[in-house]
Amino acid sequence: MQHPTTRRSFVNAGSLGFLGLSLRNALAAEAASKLPAPGKAKSVILFWLEGGPSHIDTWDPKTNSNFKPISTNVPGIHVSELLPTIAKRMDKFALVRSMHTRGTDHPQATHYAITGHEINPAMQFPSLGSIITKEMGPRNAVPPHVLVPKWDRSRQYEEYFRAAFLGGDYDPMCIPDPAKPGFQVTDLSLPKSVSQAAVESRSAFLKAVDRRYRELNDTADHTNMDAFTAQAWKMILTPAVRDAFDLSKESDKMKERYGKDSIGQSCLLARRLVEAGSRFVTAAGYHGTSWDTHSDNDKGHRDRLAPPLDRTLTALVDDLEERGLLESTLVIAMGEFGRTPIINANLGRDHWPNCWSLALSGGGIKTGQVIGVSDERGANVVDRVVTMGDLYATIYQALGIDWKKEYMSPIGRPVKIANSLDDKTGSPVKELLA
């Protein structure tokens, strides 16, 4: 027996309020974006190492580290003994050991790393992910910009990942920790008031959506919003989209491969999302176990921090390669800064933006190499300084985005999308571009 969806039952479903603004805004981007000239990369996964790893204890081993350097499968390149699995796959990575950025505390440095700009009380700046989402547009019906997991406590950092004056269309969809029991993306869940019969009768259901919203005021804004909301329903009713967020589709072996903690499951979900069509996914599983080792640096890196990085980053890159996705997916593993070459009184290392390291893989990047040189203690860059603007320009170039582009802000100020030190425009690191 069929139970057709009436206008009344649709209204009782909550007028689509349960969808959440993030889902509707993601869909709205489809109407506002134009695809750029294609590059090798189609998506980005930012493996966010929150808190700032010690570069001299990971990517750029020095004599003032208590951890030994080990050889990799690329002659001449060494990494810390804390990264043995990565060492066996160094041919799949490029290391930048000469990052030089701004911000000596976490809010300043995180804002700078995520937006490319220093904090300015007069205006907010769009994040890297939001710019990429705007410039490239969505693929399929999947949210193009996702942050996983969202911050459960402080929301300050989460704001830095948003689109600012570009508008909510390009904000990330912020979802819960996928490693927690009962993980579910509520924006993709039907309300109890919508019957299964209505879901099974998709055509009639979507017609009911259209009828409901045609009754609204016939303004341009309403018309656009109605279309996006109807698309949101289509997204909910599309199995491929729902499946992208469904980690139960993954085998237990695959979950173990990535790690069943927040770090591993966030990266596994990121892979599922870019596979389905997302443009930019931030895997921020280090929320709860930050790299901010002001005390017991060695113990923290050895026991809590480096092992998940070594396990999960290699699992992600290997998995992408096995699925034929690595060339089209740029993977970036970085935090907001490095850590001091000198150990403090609490056996920790403090913040150090002057010289630090990050790792890249996939996306057409030329791997198996090191860019830049730091001094013997990892305190200063001695060759090939790379600024945040240079990194951004490199990412944009890999994606086929014009890295010289500027946006006009609401206060009439041009904003560079690849902003470098002293308000200069960054330049792509040509050695990284294959």
What is the predicted function of each stretch?
Residues 1-434:
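Ligand-binding pockets and gating/stacking loops
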